[in-house]
Amino acid sequence: MSSSSFLPENNEYLHILKIFRTFALAFSLHKKIMNLSSIRTMNQHTLLSPFHFEGKGLHTGLHIHASFYPAAPNTGIRICRSDLEGQPTYPAVADYVAATERGTVLEYGEWKVSTVEHVLSALYAMGVDNCLITLDGPEMPILDGSAKYYIEAIEQVGLQEQDAPQKVYAITEKIEYTSEQGNQMLILPCDHYAAQVTICYPSALLGTQTAQLDDLADYKQQLSLARTFCLVREIEPLLRRGLIKGGDLQNALVIYETPMSQDDLDFMTDKLGQPRLDANQLGYLSPLNYPNEPARHKLLDLIGDMSLCGFRLQAQIVALRPGHSFNTKCCKQLREKILSEQ
């Protein structure tokens, strides 16, 4: 989950678009030197043993228990609501995306799970193909707002190789998605998984940031600590709409970049159960884990959202102004394309 972005000034936006287009042009050269028909395959993996977490949901504020279990080959990532009658269980795929406001929500009937992007990102990056997740509530625990604890838990329990090949889809031709709001995504052929994002905000603190991951092996070091973020001026409307009931300065990177009255700031910190802050001190309300942490978190989110295609991708994904709504729409279209070719 992370904050929505806006169009920058025209000159800057055109410059970013020019950079974005170079990836498409570079593809014609890249295609000449790589064998696009080759698919790097390996066997599927699941967890060697279970692990468990508990914590509050970012939006509901509920205390939720989450358990992660090994699963059989070709199961994929499945999520069970153990608190509901019959314990309904469905796969984490784009078919079930129902909402994308402040996070990715999967839903089918009474089965609903919110804020799935962080854990899906970690499972994908760590090479977990099959896993059963059980929850006793409607949302994944937010933990510290990053993928850190998921990565550490997966490393601690280890992985087990399974006697079945991974479901791999290799991109062989450029795919481009755009939206009327200025979001763009290129998916290019590559012999492994790589991704890059650029975010654009009309903010002196955020501005334009880029983050990239050249190999999933670097995920832990380069992305796992990047926390979800939001602007202080966005918090009050979210609270009034019944969102971020579990939000605090320990599970999100909060950015104070638009001055407000001390009374208004006190109201919000009191509502969140946090210590009061000085309304004159603009900036990040907690230390950054990376200089470009917001962009890195957007990349973390992108990996989680795109994992909903249900396949391991051999591709380079380049996204301009990504967000959950745009990411999952692209993922749905990509999944439909993949399934139509099976």
Summary of predicted features, one role per range:
Residues 9, 13, 22, 26, ...:
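Short, positively charged and aromatic/hydrophobic N-terminal segments
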Residues 17-19:
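Catalytic cores of phosphodiester-bond-cleaving enzymes
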Residues 33-342:
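Short acidic-hydrophobic catalytic motif
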